[in-house]
Structure formats: structure tokens, C-alpha cells
Amino acid sequence: MALAGSALAAKAYRNFSAAIYVPVGAVMALKDPKVRDAQYQRITSQLKFDKVYLEVYRSGQFADAATLEAVKKFFIAKGIGVAGGIAYSAAETGGQFNTLDYEDTRDRQMCRRASELAAAHFDEVILDDFFFYSTKSEADIAAKGTRSWTQYRLERMRQVSDELVLKPARAVNPHVKVTIKYPNWYEHFQALGYDLDQEAKQFDAIYTGTETRDPEITDQLLQQYESYLAFRFFSNVRPNGANRGGWVDTYATRYVDRYAEQLWDTLFAKAPEITLFNWADLASPAPVAPGDRQAWSGMSTSFNWDDMARSSPTNTGEAPGWARVAGYSLEQVDKFLGQLGHPVGVASYKPYQSSGEDFLHNYLGNLGVPVELTPDFPSNAPLVLLTEAARQDPAIVTRIKQHLAGGKSVVITSGLLRALQGKGIEDVAELEATDRRIAVHDYIGAYGAGRGTSLNEAGRTARDVLFPEIRFYTNDSWPLIRGVAEARGVPILVMNRYARGALYVLNIPDNPGDLYELPQPVASAIRTYLQGELPVRIDAPARVSLFEFDNSTFIVESFRSEPASVGIAVTGNHKLLRDLVSGEELPSVPPPQQQDSRRRSGPPEQGTHTEFRADVPPHSFRVFTVR
């Protein structure tokens, strides 16, 4: 079975563990002692790690027992922990991922066999994120009957988890712990049988796919912030340490910094373990290429290519590979992670088996709004953010009313407003998301009666952004931020008071990526309202994120390709911000003049804020604590 803890080598990092996933093809290659020694030397000369996951099955290929034992014995002798892995995939066709057909007798037998094989050799087993259900064979169609594909697949995969994975594994090895890794496409899980509600609790633990890759050239177009948000969300699905770690691969990036960012953001979310996929890439003798990073190559960025290239644990002089990029990036954040508290953010509710305004939270995260996503309604939060996904909760209007009656705030998006029209939201506010669209490039901020003040950026003509028109009644609802086009206005943020609370509607562009096109004063005004009682806010261009913690520490990270000047407002009276990486201390600066959007477009600030300003290099982070 797995290696006893007492035989492990010293922990590679202080604040997390590092693991490498070894796919079955790489496991079989390690059967050769020469290959094994060479690849191990290549990786360990550039990267420290604590554990390997040795895969027993993928795409029709099984590892044999003798090879598994030989490879396991090799790593144990090196003081490396061992665990098993399974990828329940079928052979790929046409570049598409194919799953097993769980109505097919042969595929069901393969599923059971893989589980039994893994449990026979390991006390810990992880399922790679192919444990979903995409086939539509004649048998599947017949078994589905009158159910939707979503309902059929959810029910079938709960059965498969129990009957073909967990029970067979535990019958072979009563001590085995089985972890299911969930991928990065959480908005669409239920349609393919992934179930964060019931299935996630069937397994001993879960794991988070935090690979976001490139946000513009990949088919998924996942935004960078998701590497953080997904781990936080899944940690609220399975709290108390049952979300065991985050998982990042080396694929689909245009510049090497993007790989480092995924690792950093996973660990900023307080993942206890980071898994690197995969062994073959990390062991490759080919040198890693810097990629398209010429625009910032001469700047003092968080990922310093020259520093990385010069550094290695053993100084072998070999050209650095992906392993060194990973090692360098992990070593950087390990220096300060222990000084950070528990992550905090704007509480946002996404019910189980829900979708709507898909992945919107990550665009908001890239706009500088820290988000804490949860599958349970956060009734104790002073402000709750609800996107269209909340429509899946049949009691959502009642929850909104109760939250407002308790003197708290609720922010709903235009997508949720539309979804709830005719379903009771009119009892709170008579607002209507119409079918009309208005292309906006001028913006006004105003709180209360009056003409308001321009929120446009001086010297910059904003691009047209297409917003849904929200109809409201004058003096019943108040637009706090409005867009204007040819003497016609559309609310960008509108407020309606109800009982002791306040309902806000945030208008989302037809293309959520157009949030990045909003003038900086508009984005800063939105942050003021959304972040409520959170102690830190930033005034920054798009693609600059804020990560807040509950002990007066925070991180500002820029995903931009040029330097960013960032205003920072911290609740209370403070003299200095101290950079926990460089040791630099930043003095407070005078508060912005009255024309600053954050002051003029919202209600009077509650309490005292101290203002600071920091420069953040491209694709870099800065870590601060207040003094």
C-alpha cells in the first residue's frame, strides 16, 4: 500500500505540499531503470516535490501490477509519497474527449477493474477529471427515457460512483481514500453528470482543477481569476479541509508567466496541495521557451526569467524546463503564504446544479472585486451578490426579501432580474430588463438628485458597450451609475430600498468581456458598492485583481502586459503599507480630490479610509500588510 508517513522525506515547502501526476504511459516508461533514473534526476534538479500520483488507467491502457510496484518502490526509496490515479477516459476521436459509456457492459467492467487495481496498490487514489458522462449511445438513449440528459446523467453517475468505483475499491482495500478531481468548467457540470451536491459528498475528498491557461486563445476562454475562485468555491462545497488541492498543467499558454500565475493564484486561495500535470512534461529534456513576453521582459516582474534560468536546487547547469518554472514559482510564494490569513470576499451564492451568466464571477474578479462563491445562501453576509445562476433556487425571491428585511444588501445582475420577472421580484422592486439594447460610451455617476458627474476617463474615448435597457420608475429606484448614448440613458447600477435593506441591480453587458472596457472610474464606483464592508478596495484598470485575507493582509495582482498604477483604500487610520516580498514601505497619500469617482458617485464613505498608491509591474503581484 501507500508509504507510511514516517518514511517520507522532509516537506518540500513550508505552506503546502507539491505533487506530480504521472499518467499511465509515463508510468509504463518508468519501468525502465535508466529512464526512471534520468527523468527523476531531470525533475529533482529543478523542482522539489512531496508526492506522485501513479496512474493505473487511461484511454483503454492499464498499468500492470509489477510495474506499479516497481515504480512505487522507487519513489518510496527516495522518500516521496505515492498515491494512485485513474483517468476514466475512452480513446479520443477527432480531438474530442470521450468518456466511458456507463450503459455498456465492457466499459462498466473497465471502470470497476481500474478502481480495484488502484486500490490494490495504494491507500490514496485520485480520479482525474474524466469521470463525467458524454456518450449518447442507443443504450444511453433507451436508459434515459423521458428524463433530461442532465437528470439522467446525474442519477447514473451517483450510481456509478457507488457501485463501480467506491464499493469495489473499498472491498479490495478497506483503508483506501478516494478523491474526485473536478475540472474547471463548473458552470456546466450537471449536464455531464458531475454533481457537487451529492456525488462530491460520496467521495472521501475532492480536488480542484485550477488550470485556466490562456484567457483569449483557448476554446474555453477562462479568465485568470478562476484559478483562485474555483478553489474557493469547491472549498465551500466541501469545507474543513476536504478540498485537498489544486491542479495545474503546462498547456495552452502564450508566455511562461501565465503558467506561474495559475500556480500562484491556486495557492493564494490557500490550497494545501498543488498537483503538477504531468511528469512527462516536467521530465522532458527540452528547454522551456519564454514565449511572447517581450513587452515586459526587461522589467522587474514577479516571474523573473533571468533569475529563474540562473536558479536551480542542484545547479546542474542544464537548461531550465517546465520543472524549473514550477519550482521557481512555488518557491516564490512559499516565502509569504504563511503570513496570510483566511481568504475573504464578496459573498456570492451559486446553487447546486445551476448555470446562468456563465463564469461571470471571474470577470468581476479580474475587475478587482474579490469574490467568495458558495453553494449555500450566505444569510449572515452584509451584502450578497446574485447572478443569473441563482434563478435555479425556487426560494430565491423569498431569500432576497428576508435578507433585505434584515437590514442587509443584495446585488442582483440584469440577467437574474430578467430571469425572475413574473416570478415575484416585482414584490421587491418594479424593475424590468427589456429586450432593447443601448450602445454606451459615456458614463455618469450620481447619488441622489442632481446632474451627476462624468465618469469618463480624461483623454480616452471609451468604446461602445452594449447594455440591456433596464426600465425603472423615477423616485422609486435611483440610478447610481448610468450610461448615456445620444440623450438616452441606461442604468449601469440602480438602487431600490426595501424594508431596512437596499437592492442593487448591476447591469451586465451582452458580452461580459466588455466589463474590461468600462472606464476606470466606472469600475471603481462599482467596486465601492459591491465590496460593502470589506476593508480594502482598489482603484485600478481592468485585469488587476484583489485578494483579501482576514488578518489585514492582501494581494494586488496584475494580469496586464503593461505596468499598472493602483490606488488602494484601507479602512481605518494607517501610516504605512508594507510589502511582504520586498520589505518596501509605502506611505499614505492624501485622499483623492472631490472629482474622484469613488467619492462622488456613491454615498458618503462609512468610517475612515487611508489611501495608498502602488505600482504593479506586468503579470506580477504585490503582497501587503497595513502598519
Protein language model regions, located:
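Glycan-processing catalytic domains of CAZymes
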Residues: 8-381, 385, 393-396, 404-405, ...
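A conserved amphipathic helix/loop scaffold
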Residues: 388-627
